[in-house]
Amino acid sequence: MNILKNIVRVGLIVTALSFNLVSCDYLDVVPPEQAGLQDATKTRKSTLGFLFTCYAGLQEDDSPIGHTSALNGSTDEFALPIEWRNDSGAFWDDYAYNLVSAANPDGLWNNYYKYIGQCYLFLRQVENNPGETLLQEWLPGEKEQWLAEAHFLIAYYHFALLRKYGPIPIITEYVPQSTPSSEFGGRCHYDYCVNWIAYQLDLAAQNLPPTREGPEWGRATSTMAKALKARVLMYAASPLWNGQFPFSSWKNKVNTPGDKDFFVGDDAKYKESIGRDDYGIELVSSSYNEKKWERAMEACQKALDFALNEGGCRLYGTEASDMTLYQTELGNNDKWLPYVPGKEDNNIQENREFKERVMMLRYMVASRYPHNKELIWGLTGKNINSRIQGRIPAHIFQTGNKTSWAGGFSAISPTLYTIEHFYTEDGVLPEEAASTGDFASRAEWFQKAGIAGNNREDIIKLCVNREPRFYAWMAFDGGDYGSKLLKASSGDAGSPCVLNMKTAAGHGYDLTRSPRNYNVTGFMTQKYVNPTAQFVFDGGAFQAGDTKPIPLIRLAELYLNLAECQANVGGANLANALANLKEVRDRAGVPTTTTVPEQSKLIEMIHNERFIEFWNEGHRYHDVRRWAEGQKYFGAKREGLNAMVKDVPFEKFNVRTTIDQPFRWNDRLYLAPIQNAEVYKNPQMVQAYGY
């Protein structure tokens, strides 16, 4: 995200980011060599820098690639070494083990409100204290656009709070430091929050451009605003917030006013069926409202249509050039095609096309190239290289001086649930395919697949005849990791790392080598690892390639959001839901049934498609919660292979094994707690249920 580079370039920093609802300390944005806040809006350059600081809160987000955050590390997608629970800023174990406490929660609550305050401070200064130079330098329409960007960010930060904490206080203006505690805001009803955020996004979209290019990419657009509104409304229509909230006795201390004024334009038709005159002290509605799904469906359709037209978006991989990008990046040589068991012969056109699709899918999430128009919004993660290394194999090769080993941490370990819920090559789950004789029987999954070749004989049947996304993003014993990861000599162009997950001499378990960095399940992930990533022979330096931005909103989400809404509305919309699901599966090279399934089956298919397509992109934490299925997915035991044994033979390694960590679910985890201090100092605030 080029914005962050611009923050440094303009030399404008945040020096007193302490805004929160308790102390009401204000934000002070002061250029380091200037006198005070008014200088922040003195010129066009300084004001633009001030605006960029409003985006800095995105770096405080639960980044999809931040594996130790609650957002990722607590889900059933992958497991981490238990020692990583002690890392600075690690909260994954609190949510995975049901240990989260209001005495010491993560700091996202204060961070988001801090940046909401930052945005309102920007709005106040631009409106009330623009410098004379700024007034002369402003380009036509620029002021309105910058204000719209701040309003977009205010809406986003409120949504980021809402999806994690449930009903929240809505901040509508800059809160001065002198505000007495009796005037602090309490939580608002969940639906009120949703309708206010949707309204703010509508207003912001009116003055935002549909696209941005070059150094402006990553700043707010109307395409982003419409896509975010669609997501907000889909979340609100989902079971947890639409009749299945488990804590009916959880009430507010203050009344939430009515919200019918927020229903304008296309939403006006829902004013009476969704809006209210007054919410009283209720925090979450206890009844189901089908109109929420209809409203969400309409917003999702409009967001998708706008993205495809005004937004200029398309699914990556739908043009021929997408399939051959690896040739531009790595060279026009078959050696760079990925290894896929059973598809070794590149002279067979079907094999070649399959492998090119695998490479395309790796590039889709690892980089943003000028022709990749799928990424609607992306984030440059903090310390990207170290987070990429967290998923790369350890102990790859000895460096040039033979005194140390190059490699990553091997730690991001996909669970067996993950491995078993990517599709087969025929587009069905392995268990379903096994029941019809179209895949190895479940009893044979951990047996050798009979693959010939150098170090390939230990590939198991579960890892053969799988879909392209499986080979793009997963890695397994006997398979390849990366494309040119090993540069084992000064003249070497690089080659893949052939995984040996069973032995300490390979990439397996060995606490003497590292007491905290090891693989937990016997599987690894290559998602986000650029095909050009490489460890260099001399010194073992890691070159990650182009690893940014990390997806926040992709066009594929708009298709699947719409499909989910259509499937839940049902009726004639089921066929449309299947068609939108098919768009994503076609790009992935996965066949789709032509017969419209029954409603519950189709919803299940869409849910699993989200699991695969958005694996490790930060959706799973929120999806399982909004579906009200926490116990089903996060309360069950988590499994891998018998990988945490040193130098284990094939037969003992390939055994279904329960991960030895205390994973637990409690329904209180549907909401995150806020700090007790917030409740003690704010007489209007109620703590999340169960804390």
Show which residues each predicted segment covers.
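Bacterial Sec-dependent N-terminal signal peptides
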Residues: 1-33
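Short coil/linker segments at helix-helix boundaries
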Residues: 133, 140, 167-187, 240-295
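Membrane-proximal, proline-rich intrinsically disordered regions
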Residues: 24-71, 460-464, 474, 675-691
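Long, intrinsically disordered, low-complexity segments
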Residues: 24, 112-115, 196, 256-291, ...
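Structural register within alpha-helical repeat arrays
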Residues: 147, 154, 229, 236, ...
